[in-house]
């Protein structure tokens, strides 16, 4: 019997990787032989995390202080009602904020907790589904959180290096969330990743787990960074990721979040993922999702293709510009063939033509 190739995937980034659409997923997805990893049992003292074959909920509430979030640490199945999660978590699951479809209203995300949240669609389940449809399997971990800078992922050592090295970059500045940055979230990212890899080795002892890929969709919180500053952060994060055992770094290119200055972040992503060994741009399509209420004639060279329309629930009247299920399914459809090319055919990815005025 041939060895099963089971790459291990980690999905990281901010809200458009986390999943923050208004509409919940249209249906549950049940994988044939792929799994999402949940780390919470480990934090409650269990020997291993758990692997599940259902897509939703996707991700998990990773509270910073367990004793603050839970009345008892005896049972990892207990659910915390601690909300205002941005202040109390390292990472969170995909969150839908639909209040009423009839009047197109949404809830503020801050009111959600582990006990009351509603799942949102997000990229990992659709990518795992499409990966299986092409005859492959995987295991994955969702480690994302909305409204965070790339600095959120740097552990204390890398954060200190970043502060030292960016001091010489013209125009470098403290990011919006910098005052609270300690490296603790980055350290927890390292912890969950290491445990995911170790628990995968225990759960799938006969499988080939040699491919370990980090997927990245982030940048909306860092729009005013100089290209060199974001490029430095990517280089340090990849160094950190390699030390954890990652073999590949995959980018879903960031899009515009109502600030054209993000073009420098996009330039940094293009540069890094074209010149760095083991790092690959999988798709640019996520840069091409129009946003309602904006004059984008100066942003796009030409109108993006029809398939990129209506990829945010704001097009349906909701005050929510996050990517929706259509967007994630389109991103997955673009990523998976390129993943096969890179991982199994030793070929470079085939990317979409450049449609951004500042890059062509």
Please give the residue ranges for each predicted region.
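Cell-envelope and extracellular/periplasmic
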Residues: 2-360
């Amino acid at each position: 019997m041939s060895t099963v190739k089971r790459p291990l995937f980690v999905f990281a980034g901010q809200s458009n990787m986390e999943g923050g659409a208004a509409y919940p997923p249209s249906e549950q997805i049940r994988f044939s032989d792929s799994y999402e990893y949940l780390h919470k049992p480990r934090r409650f003292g269990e020997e291993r995390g758990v692997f599940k074959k259902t897509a939703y909920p996707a991700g998990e509430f990773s509270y910073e202080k367990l004793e603050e979030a839970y009345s008892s640490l005896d049972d990892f199945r207990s659910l915390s009602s601690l909300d205002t999660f941005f202040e109390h978590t390292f990472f969170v699951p995909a969150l839908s904020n639909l209040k009423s479809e009839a009047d197109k209203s949404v809830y503020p995300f801050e009111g959600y907790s582990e006990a009351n949240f509603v799942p949102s669609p997000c990229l990992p389940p659709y990518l795992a589904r499409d990966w299986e449809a092409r005859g492959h399997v995987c295991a994955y971990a969702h480690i994302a959180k909305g409204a965070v800078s790339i600095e959120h992922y740097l552990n204390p050592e890398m954060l200190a290096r970043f502060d030292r090295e960016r001091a010489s970059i013209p125009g470098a500045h403290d990011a919006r969330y910098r005052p609270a940055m300690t490296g603790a979230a980055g350290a927890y990212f390292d912890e969950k990743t290491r445990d995911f890899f170790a628990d995968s080795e225990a759960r799938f002892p006969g499988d080939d787990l040699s491919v370990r890929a980090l997927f990245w969709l982030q940048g909306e919180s860092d729009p005013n960074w100089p290209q060199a500053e974001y490029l430095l952060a990517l280089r340090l994060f990849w160094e950190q990721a390699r030390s954890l055992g990652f073999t590949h770094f995959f980018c879903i290119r960031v899009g515009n979040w109502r600030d054209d200055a993000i073009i420098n972040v996009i330039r940094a992503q293009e540069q890094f993922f074209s010149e760095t060994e083991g790092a690959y741009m999988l798709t640019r399509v996520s840069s091409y999702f129009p946003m309602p209420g904006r004059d984008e004639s100066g942003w796009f060279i030409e109108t993006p293709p029809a398939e990129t329309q209506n990829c945010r629930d704001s097009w349906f009247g909701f005050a929510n510009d996050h990517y929706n299920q259509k967007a994630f399914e389109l991103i997955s459809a673009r990523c998976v063939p390129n993943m096969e090319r890179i991982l199994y055919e030793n070929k470079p990815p085939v990317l979409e033509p450049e449609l951004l005025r500042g890059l062509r």
